[in-house]
């Protein structure tokens, strides 16, 4: 009887062990207070509100709640998300411009799948989110690290790297960078958008932490600022998340 060895796709040669998953395994141990994983405090979950909303959805529209839906997401939800984003300054994002994904990680995977070919240059902050590195490398990206300081990515250096490498995209976490915690200044945010237009380069703005702040609100997102820089909106992919403020 002939035995066939299982042959995986070549792209899986780029897959590395997830450091984040290894860290999360520690959370199951008693007495652990983890500063490593981005878990929201479970005591803050609105369990009663989520239970009530789930029961109402099943009572009022059971077929719609349990049936297949549109790929881009449930339309009333996208309408609510459009209003939510408008309240945060991104006032002209129509529901039809939104896609609902299973976490922003799926959005990043879709961007990698649709935008990155093997060998493409992709600029990321140094350091940046580990899961994004793994995701983009899976699709064969050649990652280029852009230096940062307390005000986020250094835009002079970013321009130099864009001009030199002509990347397929630039991935940034402007608000409370992970793992740096850096906050991209308002001046640099505008400059990033100007660079996108100047070099016709896609900017991916990952914004899972924009609602988590004490005291003064952070600067507007790149998405909210984009109307001030003509031509930049079409070169911007914004990834938001409810995982930190509602529940994962």
Where are these regions (language model features)?
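Residues in well-ordered beta-strands of folded domains
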Residues: 36, 223, 240
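PLP-dependent aminotransferase class I/II
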Residues: 235-248
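N-terminal "arm"/small-domain region of PLP-dependent enzymes with the aminotransferase-like
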Residues: 1-71, 76, 83, 244-247
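Short, histidine-centered active-site or binding-site loop motifs used for metal coordination
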Residues: 39, 173-177, 243
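Conserved core of the PLP fold type I
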Residues: 59, 64-200, 210-231, 237
């Amino acid at each position: 009887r002939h035995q066939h060895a299982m042959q995986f796709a070549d792209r899986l040669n780029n897959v590395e062990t997830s450091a984040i998953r290894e860290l999360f395994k520690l959370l199951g141990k008693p007495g652990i207070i983890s500063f490593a994983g981005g878990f929201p405090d479970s005591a803050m979950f609105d369990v009663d509100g989520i239970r009530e909303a789930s029961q109402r959805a099943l009572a009022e529209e059971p077929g719609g709640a349990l049936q297949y839906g549109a790929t881009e997401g449930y339309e009333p939800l996208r309408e609510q998300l459009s209003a939510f984003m408008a309240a945060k300054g991104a006032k002209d994002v129509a529901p039809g411009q939104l896609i609902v994904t299973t976490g922003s990680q799926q959005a990043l995977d879709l961007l990698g799948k649709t935008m990155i070919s093997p060998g493409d240059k992709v600029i990321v902050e140094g350091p940046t989110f580990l899961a994004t590195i793994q995701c983009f490398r899976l699709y064969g990206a050649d990652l280029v690290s852009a230096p940062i300081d307390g005000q986020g990515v250094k835009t002079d250096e970013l321009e130099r790297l864009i001009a030199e490498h002509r990347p397929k995209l630039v991935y940034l976490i402007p608000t409370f960078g992970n793992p740096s915690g850096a906050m991209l200044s308002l001046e640099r945010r505008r400059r990033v958008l100007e660079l996108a237009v100047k070099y016709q380069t896609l900017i991916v703005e990952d914004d899972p932490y924009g609602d988590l702040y004490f005291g003064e609100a952070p600067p507007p997102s790149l998405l909210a600022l984009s109307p001030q820089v003509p031509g930049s909106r079409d070169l911007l992919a914004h990834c938001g998340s409810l995982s930190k403020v509602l529940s994962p």
